[in-house]
Amino acid sequence: FGTVSGSAVANVMTTGAFTIPLMKRLGYKRAFAGSVEAVASTGGQIMPPIMGATAFIMAEFLGISYLKVAMYALLPALLYYIALFLSIHFEAKKNNMHGLDRAELPKVSTVLKERGHLFLPLIIIIGTLLLGFSAPFAALCGIASTIPTALLRKSTRKHINLTNILKALEEGAKNTVTVALSCACAGIVIGVIFITGLGLEFTNLVLSAADNHLFLALVLTSFAGILLGMGMPTAPAYIMQTALLVPALVKLGVIVEAAHMFVFYFAILSAITPPVALAVYAANGISRASIWDSSLAALRLGATGYIIPFMFVFGPSLLLI
């Protein structure tokens, strides 16, 4: 869900309502259950095939197709989720916990038969992109396919009525306005940065503070990226970081694709980084745990996410470049 919505908080509130109570029932601590949901939801924006709106903005900045951005993101995203899965697995082993009884597990074939058709809009979007059409056209095709898709099965056909269609259009318009306003405000900030020369000054400041040492510059950039992204949607946070932070990394010899992916990661990870960890706060509303316990657990579970950007800067082959 997170890879489609492009919002860690929205993902937490949607899927967390089911997953967090289930994890608590299986024996996981409240803080751990909430942090798992927050970290997993945050990673949705780095996992192809959709990756939210920010990946499309990156494609525009780099002047490449969205599919290349998805290719760059694939291996790092897999590492992120493998590390998260192993952390959860070892936590379960440590506390001698077991999964659901086989009788409680739904059959995959039954689920696919009843709900598998709901993947069609996503398949259409990906297929349209693979055929070389633009991202807006792919999104339009995906939206247009939702109603015919829902009509394919009786279980989803009952939800198709004028009230629900109008409600969906209303929610879509609200989400569009939120993203558009955020990007517009970020655009104003970027305009000021270029007019005043602040971007160049910031680049020189990072280079001077790091004394031209790449690793130190990356550490400073990661801290700045998290600070700029705190409490902000990923898209405007990424746009501002592109103007302020990417030029400094490129000057130090980082390839431009890796530099963009680096700031992209830290714009996203601000959602699980205290003190303004919005995804953790959202999960905490469901888990009812201590916010600091949840934040520390999220930092521990998401630690790989903070390391991976350094890995692909020093080893760009991880991005399949």
What are these regions (language model features)?
Residues 62, 193-209, 316-321:
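Membrane-interface helix termini and inter-helical loops of multi-pass transporters
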Residues 26-32, 113-119, 173-179, 205-222, ...:
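Membrane-interfacial loop-to-helix junctions in multi-pass transporters
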Residues 59-75, 247-258:
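Helix-coil boundary and interhelical linker segments in multi-pass alpha-helical membrane proteins
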Residues 136, 163-200, 214, 218-227, ...:
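Core transmembrane alpha-helical segments of multi-pass membrane transporters/permeases
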Residues 1, 33-55, 71-87, 265-273, ...:
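Membrane-embedded alpha-helical segments of transport systems
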Residues 71-175, 278-321:
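Long, contiguous bundles of hydrophobic transmembrane helices that form the permeation core
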Residues 1-44, 54, 234-266, 278-293, ...:
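Hydrophobic transmembrane alpha-helices that form the pore/transport pathway of multi-pass ion
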Residues 42, 53, 57-61, 122-130, ...:
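Alpha-helical transmembrane segments of multipass membrane proteins
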